[in-house]
């Protein structure tokens, strides 16, 4: 689980550096894993 969580965390951190939320806009599954309810509700992301 650590390897998967770290991989997802790195992807999200890379996007957060820009100060944007492209993950939410693209309905990326990473949003569900990250636990950002605001993104999940707005984009209707399905939990994986």
Swiss-Prot record:
CC annotations in GO: plasma membrane
Keywords attached to this entry: Cell membrane, Lipoprotein, Membrane, Methylation, Pheromone, Prenylation
Modified residues (Cysteine methyl ester): 45
Propeptide span(s): 46-48
Lipid attachment locations (S-farnesyl cysteine): 45
GO molecular function: pheromone activity
Protein localization: Cell membrane
Primary location recorded for the protein, binned into one broad class: membrane
Membrane topology: Lipid-anchor
Role of this protein: Activates B-regulated development.
Name this polypeptide is given: Mating-type pheromone BAP1(2)
Species whose genome carries this gene: Schizophyllum commune (Split gill fungus)
Name of the gene this protein is made from: BAP1(2)
């Amino acid at each position: 689980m650590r390897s998967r969580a770290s991989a997802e965390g790195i992807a999200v951190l890379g996007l957060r550096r820009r100060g944007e939320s492209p993950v939410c806009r693209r309905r990326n599954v990473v949003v569900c894993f990250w636990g950002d309810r605001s993104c999940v509700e707005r984009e209707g992301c399905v939990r994986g």
